[in-house]
Amino acid sequence: MYCLQWLLPVLLIPKPLNPALWFSHSMFMGFYLLSFLLERKPCTICALVFLAALFLICYSCWGNCFLYHCSDSPLPESAHDPGVVGT
């Protein structure tokens, strides 16, 4: 379970508020996970635990899934603020 300490913080990285950055964020996270899995070769148990946690987060649509944005969940209130989006 040593390799899990490098995978679990990835789930805590928040998505950007600006919807224009969601694609680049998901590409970065996908490439990071792919390079991590190829370089470190985590054990099967750690990989399964991480994939189960990722599936549960994305399936529940909490809004922190980096693979896609759930259509049911609205944008945060600060996403409509031009001061935040314009930065």
From Swiss-Prot:
The chain crosses the membrane at residues 19-39, 43-63. GO terms for cellular component: cytoplasm; membrane; nucleus. It is a multi-pass membrane protein. Disulfide bonds: none annotated. Changing K15R: In RNA edited version. It comes from the Eukaryota. The keyword Transmembrane helix applies. Its main location: cytoplasm. Cervical tissues (at protein level). Urothelium (at protein level). Endothelial cells of urinary bladder vessels (at protein level). Urinary bladder stromal cells (at protein level). Cervical tissues. Kidney. Ubiquitous. Changing Y2C: In RNA edited version. It is found in: Cytoplasm; Nucleus; Membrane. Acts as a tumor suppressor; induces growth arrest at G(1)/S checkpoint and apoptosis via RB1-dependent and p53/TP53- and NF-kappa-B-independent mechanisms. Modulates expression of genes involved in the regulation of proliferation, cell cycle and apoptosis. Belongs to the BLCAP family. Down-regulated in cervical carcinoma tissues. Expression in stage III-IV cervical carcinomas is significantly lower compared to stage I-II. Down-regulated in bladder carcinoma. Down-regulated in renal cell carcinoma. Down-regulated in colorectal cancerous tissues. This is Apoptosis inducing factor BLCAP. It comes from Homo sapiens (Human).
